């Protein structure tokens, strides 16, 4: 179902009481059909279709990441612990670039992301690497 911008400027009323505006609720159908008791419009809180959220599409790379099938402690070692195993796994991962891009965009401060430690990512952001 497509919506026009004017579709969400209506106010929802129930028994002549103001319930609020639907300006930010595209999933609420205030159409006149079907009607409920006493001919009042029936509200539906269920959308006609489900769209994949943009964030979900962007994060689908995580399902293909090799680290998803590995012990997370390798990627989040204790202070002073070795990061060698995690970096080795990252080298063969098909989503390494997407992982690093995500970590840089979301300012991930802990763990190995895209084959780089937090310190290495900071240096990369500053242009040192």
Swiss-Prot record:
Keywords per UniProt: 4Fe-4S, Cytoplasm, Disulfide bond, DNA-binding, Iron, Iron-sulfur, Metal-binding, Transcription, Transcription regulation
Superkingdom assignment: Bacteria
Cofactor(s) listed: [4Fe-4S] cluster
Predominant location category: cytoplasm
Recorded consequence of changing residue 99 to A: Required to complement filamentous phenotype in depletion experiments
Sites where the protein binds [4Fe-4S] cluster: 67, 90, 93, 99
Reported phenotype of the disruption mutant: Essential. In depletion experiments, individual cells are elongated and/or filamented, with diminished septum formation and aberrant septal placement. The septa that do form may be immature as cytokinesis does not occur. Has no effect on FtsZ accumulation. Cells are less viable, colonies are smaller and the mutant is non-acid-fast under conditions of acetamide withdrawal.
Post-translational modification, as annotated: The Fe-S cluster can be nitrosylated by nitric oxide (NO).
Cofactor binding notes: Binds 1 [4Fe-4S] cluster per subunit. Following nitrosylation of the [4Fe-4S] cluster binds 1 [4Fe-8(NO)] cluster per subunit.
Induction line: In exponential phase (at protein level).
Primary role: Acts as a transcriptional regulator. Probably redox-responsive. The apo- but not holo-form probably binds DNA. Affects the localization or efficiency of septum formation. Complemented by whiB2 of M.tuberculosis and whiB of S.coelicolor.
Family designation: Belongs to the WhiB family.
Note: In this protein one of the ligands for the Fe-S cluster may be provided by Asp-71 rather than Cys-67.
Quaternary assembly: Oligomeric in native gel electrophoresis.
Name of the protein this chain belongs to: Transcriptional regulator WhiB2
Organism, scientific name: Mycolicibacterium smegmatis (Mycobacterium smegmatis)
């Amino acid at each position: 179902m497509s919506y026009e911008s004017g579709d969400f400027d209506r106010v929802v009323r129930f028994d002549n009481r103001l319930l609020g505006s639907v300006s930010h609720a595209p999933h609420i159908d205030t159409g006149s059909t079907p009607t409920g008791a006493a001919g009042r419009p029936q509200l539906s809180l269920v959308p006609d279709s489900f769209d994949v959220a943009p964030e979900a599409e962007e994060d689908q790379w995580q399902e293909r990441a090799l680290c998803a099938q590995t012990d997370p402690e390798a990627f989040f070692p204790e202070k002073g612990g070795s990061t060698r195993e995690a970096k080795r796994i990252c080298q063969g991962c098909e989503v390494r670039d997407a992982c690093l891009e995500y970590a840089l965009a979301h300012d991930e401060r802990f763990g190995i992301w895209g084959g780089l430690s937090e310190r290495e990512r900071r240096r990369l952001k500053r242009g040192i690497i």
